[in-house]
């Protein structure tokens, strides 16, 4: 069947294909967060978005593909908002802002990450796209660290890939250990993160920061 015909079948009357896709992604984030990945049927997401199952499949080949697509969309939106809030912010300051928000975030992306990680352990259909997604996040973080090294914010002796892995592990851990399970004081958490980020600086810069304190 012609691809354009398939996409036209997946549209809501008076709504573009892009708007239908966005509606499906928002519905998926809400339904996955409410019912979990295993407890969610494709029909549940289609109904929440106000479309048919056929319309959903015109945009996404499977429930697993929809989960990861929702993750990518919400993740990009959060990052875009952070950059827009302060375009002149340094990379290490950006990492601190993201880090400070981790324990108290209530965004759909955090819920989607948890559902994706849990489902990936037992479902290969989820594991494959989740590996790709995590790889993309790690690559983005590593590029960010390389840019910080070029600006003498981060020690060139440190591995960007290792720092990216640490950041991912921190983000995934705080998504799993929510404030309801174990709260942490905002000021104490921020102080700890500040020390960690300061330790990433080149030795001369780090020594100057320590002397200033």
Label every model-predicted segment.
Residues 63, 70, 74, 78, ...:
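Hydrophobic/aromatic residues within well-ordered alpha-helical segments
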Residues 69, 79-110, 160-167, 190:
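Hydrophobic alpha-helical connector segments
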Residues 20-23, 27-65, 69:
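Helix-turn-helix
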